Amino acid sequence: MLSKQIPLGIYEKALPAGECWLERLRLAKTLGFDFVEMSVDETDARLARLDWSREQRLALVSAVAETGVRVPSMCLSAHRRFPLGSEDDAVRAQGLEIMRKAIQFAQDVGIRVIQLAGYDVYYQQANDETRCRFRDGLKESVDMASRAQVTLAMEIMDYPLMNSISKALGYAHYLNNPCFQLYPDIGNLSAWDNDVQMELQAGIGHIVAVHVKDTKPGVFKNVPFGEGVVDFERCFETLKQSGYCGPYLIEMWSETAENPAAEVAKARDWVKARMAKAGMVEAA
């Protein structure tokens, strides 16, 4: 794994739904992936993972050891429902408690990176106060992550507050902590009026992983690869030439499809072909 030029992973929600991680990791291995990214979203079912018992956590660690397929990252989107910028103190406190539990969970099972959703609020109206509370919440979260030696990494979003690497870098400079980095989504980055290549170059040195998906302006999910606006070859070329050597994660939501494995295999082949064209020869 350490000698592999391009670590390639798959998002949990691309694979069949369920709570058996041994089965999920075995399938990911069969499909040729190096790792799976766990989702902890705003649903009660996935939030419940943060309250797993010691035995449940050990079962995940054991599944990783048995298959050799890692779970190095968590997509923590639960803060849509419990935002750190909420003006409701009880909701905001719940958001911070979710963060604490997520960091503890990551520490227990070996997750290194928690991808954060860059929303001050999601279902409410944003304002100066929600942004201030969000900044303060991030500061408290990064302090917790530092003590646990876990990295928090901001996603580039489908939301104006965090829709460019430049904006996320502003938070990185404000927090000034090595445990806060960036986790750009080249689909989200491309769907806005960004100079995508310049943005990617600006983030080098702070990018710990990259989400790979296609998008259209205003459409951020479930756009089939090749039908959106993302110039994948140029993005891969820019990242390669800038010296980025980290993982790539194919983000899909095919868990309820008739044949999720077939959908994932098709997307994998499409993405790897673009990587090969970009000179990432090991991807072919």
From Swiss-Prot:
Keywords assigned: Isomerase
Enzyme class label: isomerase
Signal peptide bounds: none
Gene3D superfamilies assigned to the protein according to its UniProt record, in alphabetical order: Divalent-metal-dependent TIM barrel enzymes
GO molecular-function term, one example from the UniProt record: L-ribulose-5-phosphate 3-epimerase activity
InterPro entries given in the database record: L-Ru-5P_3-Epase, L-Ru-5P_3-Epase_Enterobacteria, Sugar_Epim/Isomerase, Xyl_isomerase-like_sf, Xyl_isomerase-like_TIM-brl
Reactions listed under catalytic activity: L-ribulose 5-phosphate = L-xylulose 5-phosphate
Induction behaviour: Induced by L-ascorbate. Repressed by UlaR.
Protein EC: 5.1.3.22
Pathway of action: Cofactor degradation; L-ascorbate degradation; D-xylulose 5-phosphate from L-ascorbate: step 3/4
Gene Ontology biological process terms, A to Z: L-ascorbic acid catabolic process
Function: Catalyzes the isomerization of L-xylulose-5-phosphate to L-ribulose-5-phosphate. Is involved in the anaerobic L-ascorbate utilization.
Family: Belongs to the L-ribulose-5-phosphate 3-epimerase family.
Name by which UniProt lists this protein: L-ribulose-5-phosphate 3-epimerase UlaE
Originating organism: Salmonella typhi
